[in-house]
C-alpha cells in the first residue's frame, strides 16, 4: 500500500502490519465493516465481558482446525500468546514438570518468559530469564531426542515450543523432525506449542503452517 507524509511525499509500504495482521492501512472493506459495526451500536468486543462475536470467531477457527483443537484464547500480541501457552502447558499436569525446551534458532518475543526461550534473542537479552529453559538444535531430531531423554529424567518436560517455519531464518522444519517430535510427545507426555505468529491464518497454503506436515494431529 502507499502512505503519504504531511508534506505529500509518497511512500511504498511493504509491511502493512506485523505477522498475521498484515492487513494494510485503512483497507476499504475493513473500514466498511468497522463503520457498520459502530452504526448498528453493537457491543464492543472486550476481554472482560462475554462477546458473541468472539464466541463466533472461536467457533469458526475450531471448524478449520483438527477436531481435537476446539478452544481459543484471544490476546494482544504474539509474546502474550506465548506466555499464556506456557502457563497452560505447565498447569495441565497434576504433578508439575520442570523443563521447557526451545530451539536455539527461534524468536518468540521479548517478555521475561518468551525472551527466555528465544534462541535468536538471548545473546542480546539484558533482562532476567525464566529458569529451566533448555535449547535444542534447530530442526535436529537427534538432538531433540537427546535433550528430551536427558531432562525427562531430571524432573520432566512440560512443553516443547517450536516455530514450524522460522520467519527469521526463512526455513521450515523437516517433516522427519515434526514426526519425531510427536512420537516423543506420546512417549514422554509433554505438550507442544506451535508458534505461528508469522505463519498462521493462511500465510501458507493451510490456515496454519503445521497442517502442511504429514501425520500431525
Show where each model-derived region lies.
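Active-site PLP attachment segment
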Residues: 112-114, 212-217
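Helix C-cap/helix->beta junction micro-motif
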Residues: 184-188
